[in-house]
Amino acid sequence: MTPLKTLLLGLLLAFPGLSARAVPAKIPRAKAPAAAPPAPAPAPAPTPPPGPSTIPGLLPMPGAPSLLTVGVPTIPAELNDLVRRYGNSRQATLLDVTTDGTQVLMGTRFGSTQQLHLVEQPMGTRSQLTFGEEPVLEARFLPQDPNVLFYLQDSGGAEFYQLYRLDRRTQKTELVTDGKSRNSSLVVSHEGRRLAWASTARNGKDTDVVLAESATPKSQKRLTELEGSWRPLDFAPGGRQLLIAQERSAQDADLWLLEVESGEKKRLTPEAPKASLTTAMFSSDGRAVFAVTDRWGEVNELVRIDPAQPAAAPRRLTSSVPWDVTSLAAARDTGAPAQLAITVNKEGYDLLYLVEPGTGALQPVGLPPGLLGGFKFPTARSDLLFFAQQTARTPQDIWMLDVRTRRTLRWTRSELGPIDPSLLVDPTLVRYPSAGGVQVPAFLYKPKLPDSGEVKKLPVVVLWHGGPEGQSRPTFSPVLQLLVAELGVAVLTPNVRGSTGYGKAFLAADDGIKREESLKDIGATLDWIAAQTDLDPARVAVTGGSYGGYLTLATAAFYPDKLRAAVDVVGISSFASFLANTQAYRRDLRRAEYGDERDPAVRAVLDRISPLSSAEKIRAALFVLQGKNDPRVPQAEAEQIVQALQKRGGTIWYALALNEGHGFRRKENRDAQLAATLAFLQETLLK
């Protein structure tokens, strides 16, 4: 998963994407059920299925019958109305472009989940192509026939994505995969004859590279039947060779060249030292391979590899750039000069460069500060580059760059919703010291307040990102802006050691048993808040999803005197039980990051830093949210910490989504989650 994807996932887990405006005085507080104003009449709630949870007393939440809760009071109708009113902000995800650059395939949400849409001209009408209840994540045009699409779709949040074929002429959709394995990383050959993707179909544990002809996609051939995780990256022109990645962890991956017909493979990167591999692509003539890796330096850089002589030292095209290269696009038009485009992550913001493939000469493209992604050169147009762009104050939309003139053309305009744009804020980048000489970078968002001359101490919400190999960046987050503008709180998004974007030494600084030392970054964050004249250390809440959920629980357990409230979304409560019960296909990948719990010395450290082991120390009010179908952090991680705190007493809210997995994707669940989270923060942080 790319750093940007990891970041976006972390924000999605902790805060669903909703909108806001500043009316602090009108936000009602959560009340006891008997005293609450009547909520709008919900649809009849189904009887919960037998045994959905080990927590007794769970009942469907009004308006979200698949969300079962206990300890959560009735949410005031006015607050639900506020959430619904600001729940319609949208963003556009660039998925693919036709070979001539005249049609764009994008993902956006008009109903409950993200679906496929087609745009056929700049600022043209969006035509919806898929209408399922489950979200669509990846999609590709068939190059020689853009009426045919292949896409990956989830089911119930379990992340066992299935591959489908859609013919736009007949609207016929056909399931290509087996309906039960996990499938990902779809690539299509330049000519459109072949497809490749990663699949766990063989044994549920190992991830193989699968090949199919696009005309007969159900006839499939496994190109790898090896232990571990393998995925396809790019076909060579002609489709006879395929770049594949072997991944042991986020910091340990190798690049291979696979002969499609014979199955023979050749290593393109040396065995040592271990290094990350972000992506790799063939040149338009297939004679060179461009890869983004930190194998030859401290940061991820663009290198040119000769596949005929992989043992030779590669040409390091961006060795002078002191920041991570985060994405790569290579033009496919063989009748035009070779063209590359990259982004560089400088202090959390993306810079776009065009790269001369031979010399590595960089040509900056001036764009507003923000985040970029989804880069695509149309196969037959090396003079056009499509990309998605967002800033902290504007939703993600799709743009096109004319490479010759450097002019950009907007293709989509996503709705902001009924938000006063003047209330949206940009963050300030701050740094503060932690143990061992580490400097922790963080983004601070503060509400716009009238200049009265008084210093007002603001309550603070700390948002921990997931991963842990993620990075907090200034993405467009309507809910983060809601917290700032509506609740009047400051939001701090730290990048503790172990985050991407600051070099591989910083990334590895929390690996294995070093995680115990890295938890001191939590204390450093709280100390920094206490040292600020305009932040209130007596009113601090923390939240986060996945690994950010672990940090949320860890803050509550190990810094109990410095915290008022915590909102844990699909977080790890015990590393030992997490590693034993996470899906088999990802268990070894996570052991490479957290340590092997089967080693007694490692197990002792993991137990010591697990919040469940110190649950009796938690004093803060706690709200735990979990998806029943989570393949990454199982439901038991949430329920064992809830049970421990219920026995101890105190404020504990719990919500379980029956039709979600690792985070909440359905709009009705996200709306209910946000309404409850706002009510929780009002009761526990702002009173």
Q: Language-model features: where?
A:
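Bacterial N-terminal signal peptides that target proteins for export
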Residues: 1-8
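Bacterial N-terminal signal peptides
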Residues: 8-16
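Boundary at the C-terminal end of the N-terminal hydrophobic targeting segment
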Residues: 19-25
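Blade/loop signatures of beta-propeller domains
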Residues: 53-82
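Peripheral, non-catalytic segments that deliver or gate enzyme domains
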Residues: 86-93, 103, 111-117, 131-457, ...
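Hydrophobic beta-strand anchors of alpha/beta hydrolase catalytic cores
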Residues: 461-463, 491
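The conserved beta1-alpha1 loop
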Residues: 464-466, 626
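Active-site-proximal cap/loop segments of hydrolase catalytic domains
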Residues: 493-687
